[in-house]
Amino acid sequence: GRNGCTTEVCVFKVTPQAQGTSLKTLVNLYTWDEEHFEAQAINIKRLYYKYKCRTAVIDANGLGIGLVDFMVKDQIDPETGELLPDFGVENDEEGFYKKFKTADTEIDAMYLVKANAPINTEAHTYVQTQLSSGKIKFLIDENQAKVKLMSTKVGQNMDNDKRAEYLKPFTLT
């Protein structure tokens, strides 16, 4: 977001497995530069509904807590005029965000991460284990994506701007 910082949204599909850990597949990646927290909240809520998400995990450390303040409030989508309801916080042990709950609240739509050194170490270890066991899948290479896209009529008919926008997630990973 703000102060020259970039906001990243990674959309993962989590597929439960009969045995062992779920398979996590990166579906898409979105990036915004220097957006106001309210604009970020609107963008995240749009993606939440577009992908029928179960949970939005938000980095609530530092400036991230400002984003949370907008996520727990309603917004009107400036493009569609639709109400984007407030998001409830799943791990609100202190009950701080319960006071923002309304009849329209998207219950437990957010999980807040407030990382510290021990959590960072645990997360790093977990991700390394998941990567080495093939439980996390990323997008295909940018060149492979471009070849696949250009082999379709849709891809061939896209102008350069639309093609670049389509390929952006593959470029970023």
Residue ranges of each PLM-predicted region?
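Conserved RecA-like P-loop NTPase helicase motor core
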Residues: 106-130
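Short acidic (Asp/Glu) and glycine-rich catalytic loops that position anionic groups and cofactors
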Residues: 21-24, 52, 100-109
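Generic extreme N-terminus detector
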Residues: 88, 93-99, 105
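RNase H-like, metal-dependent nuclease domains and their acidic two-metal-ion catalytic environment used
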Residues: 1-93, 121, 125, 137-173
